[in-house]
Amino acid sequence: MRFADRPTTEVDVFVAAPPERIWPLVSEINTPSQFGTELQKAVWLEVEGLEGPPPCPGARFTGHNFHAARGEWQTTNVIIDCEPNQVFAWAVGDDPSFPAATWRYELTPEGDGTRLRFRAQMGPGPSGMTAVIEQMPDKEERIIARRLDEWAANMTATLTGIKEQAEDGA
């Protein structure tokens, strides 16, 4: 697996609640910071000419992150898809057409509840990880696999937290 292949990871969970109860949790940019270990907080940025309040497409936020191997850093993020009760997605970086990563929640009604998916894709734009790969190109596959595992663990923790909160509100 190479960075040029735009590696992805996806996790999902069944939530015994309707999409309308889950939506406020997935569209709240600080939800992952409540359950995962990397995102510490997120802050909306002002954007002139925005056609509505966040989290509408084009809205931007700063992500404040921490990783034991890297320390602290910030990212600019842009909402790229926002369909209430269905999809919430953002791109990492100033240029959403060339992001460092893309993150996406999808809510699909299923029986008496909702199938909640959380997907993340690396690239195609540069990130802190691409600099590490450039320094150790022979370890690219291992670096990517480890990073995808870290992402999946945080994503799973986030979905578990969302599930518990949404079902507690039942």
Where are these regions (language model features)?
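Hydrophobic ligand-binding cavity/cleft-lining segments
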Residues: M1-C56
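Structural motif
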Residues: A16, C82-P84, E110
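Short amphipathic alpha-helical segments
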Residues: P18-R21, E150, N154
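Beta-strand/loop substructures that line and gate deep hydrophobic ligand-binding cavities in soluble
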Residues: G93-A153
